[in-house]
Amino acid sequence: MELTLGDLQQIELICIEASAWGLREEVVDEAETLINDGYQPVVAYEMAYNDWVK
């Protein structure tokens, strides 16, 4: 699957916001698991962020 520049920017913004909460590693780890489960990368990062940063 190829990611667009917009996808990469959105993922990076999610990671920056997660980092502000000290949760970047947790969000990335969960997003990678969700991607392996078949979710689209941007959706996976959004879900992981929403799960960790409530």
Language-model features, listed with the residues they occupy:
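C-terminal alpha-helical interaction appendages
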Residues: 1-54
